[in-house]
């Protein structure tokens, strides 16, 4: 509650559209000992937040959040290096009427071609990316996408396949979660 009030005051607003539990080790639920979900639900009833959402880096917690039906959206690491499990999360969100917010769309800086990443992300149904920019060149590429668009061409598909062959598996997304 205190964090929410601080956010409202700092943002100089009466409400927050999407209030996210950021990377909890568990899936907050009504009646939980932690009181997190109950506090968010009360704030929603008071009109201080519009949607309760969650971010996570753990597949099990993310899946539990989807299955719970309690959340408006899930924010999770997602790039064109995503495997079957991550793709299943996207589909789970879609079928449960939840939004999917992709973080780490450049795989924590591992990917270098922002135009290809943006073109791939644009064809993913029910996915909205939050682009973390680590280099000025990435910003330039994303701004180019806004101006010109980015089509998923055969050349970009080949880049994706090459990167998947070379980079997939256990790789660091640069999120610092393991620290």
Question: In which residue ranges do the predicted regions lie?
Answer:
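Glycine/proline-rich, positively charged
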Residues: 1-101, 106-109
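Structured C-terminal cap/extension of enzyme domains
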Residues: 88-102, 106-179
């Amino acid at each position: 509650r205190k964090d929410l009030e601080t956010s409202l005051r700092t943002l100089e607003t009466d409400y927050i559209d999407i209030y996210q539990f950021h990377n909890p080790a568990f899936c907050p639920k009504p009646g939980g000992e932690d009181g997190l979900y109950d506090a968010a639900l009360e704030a929603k009833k008071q009109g201080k937040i519009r949607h309760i959402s969650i971010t996570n880096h753990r597949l099990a917690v993310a899946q539990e959040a989807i299955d719970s039906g309690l959340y408006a959206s899930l924010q999770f690491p997602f790039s064109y290096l995503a495997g079957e499990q991550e793709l299943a999360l996207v589909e789970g969100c879609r079928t449960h009427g939840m939004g999917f917010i992709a973080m780490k769309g450049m795989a924590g800086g591992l990917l270098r071609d922002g135009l290809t990443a943006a073109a791939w992300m644009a064809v993913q149904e029910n996915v909205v990316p939050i682009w973390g920019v680590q280099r000025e060149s990435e910003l330039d590429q994303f701004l180019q996408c806004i101006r010109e668009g980015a089509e998923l061409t055969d050349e970009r598909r080949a880049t994706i396949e090459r990167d998947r062959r070379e980079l997939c598996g256990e790789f660091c997304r640069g999120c610092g979660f393991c620290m």
